[in-house]
A protein has these predicted regions:
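A short, flexible loop at the N-terminus of ABC-type nucleotide-binding domains that lies
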Residues: 2-5, 9-22, 29-31, 91, ...
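The feature captures the beta-strand-to-loop junction immediately N-terminal to the Walker
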Residues: 36-38
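Helix-to-loop junction immediately C-terminal to a conserved catalytic motif
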Residues: 51
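ABC ATPase NBD coupling module
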Residues: 66-78, 92
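Q-loop/switch helix immediately C-terminal to the Walker
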Residues: 83, 90-104
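Conserved ABC ATPase "signature" region
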Residues: 103-117
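Conserved ABC ATPase signature
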Residues: 122-126, 130
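Hydrophobic anchor residue at the start of the ABC signature
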Residues: 136
Length: 149
């Protein structure tokens, strides 16, 4: 998969400074990219635009050359939130949390080092790192690209 942000421009309120100013970014399957900037400089906004949660004021997001906006009801780009405890229902066991997304392949669960015993636990019974693995597995599901937030 190839995810592209072309000429992305975004500002929250007209008259405010632009959070993104004609930004270009290309991500290929398997690539890991980090963004470093002070708070308020658009890292999360960029990820939200790349995942389709926000629309840019200018520019476009393409997945394998096809506009991301053309995916109706199914978006192959998913967010992996920075604070995993806020991304899951605390009253559901982890096996049920994984069912909320698309089917998660057993291979992904193994590759992320998720232990079988963790499946019956509630989110509050897992460490932050263990919980993050579940969020990654759920975001990846089948045939997904992931953006961090």
């Amino acid at each position: 998969m190839k995810l592209e942000g072309r000429n992305l421009t975004f500002q929250y309120d007209k008259g405010d400074r632009r959070i993104l100013n004609h930004m270009h970014i290309t991500l290929e399957s398997g690539e890991r990219v980090g963004m470093a900037a002070p708070s308020g400089f658009g890292k999360t906004t960029c990820c939200k635009i790349l995942a389709g949660y926000e629309q840019p004021d200018e520019g476009e997001v393409l997945l394998d050359g096809k506009p991301l906006s053309s995916y109706r009801g199914y978006c192959p780009v998913q967010m992996i939130w920075q604070h995993p405890e806020q991304a899951v229902n605390p009253k559901k066991r982890m096996k049920d949390v994984l069912k909320e997304g698309d089917k998660v392949e057993t291979r992904i669960i193994r590759e992320l080092g998720i232990e079988e015993g963790w499946m019956m636990r509630f989110p509050g019974e897992l460490s932050g790192g263990e919980l993050q693995r579940f969020c990654i597995a759920r975001a990846l599901g089948e045939d997904k690209a992931a953006a961090g937030g």
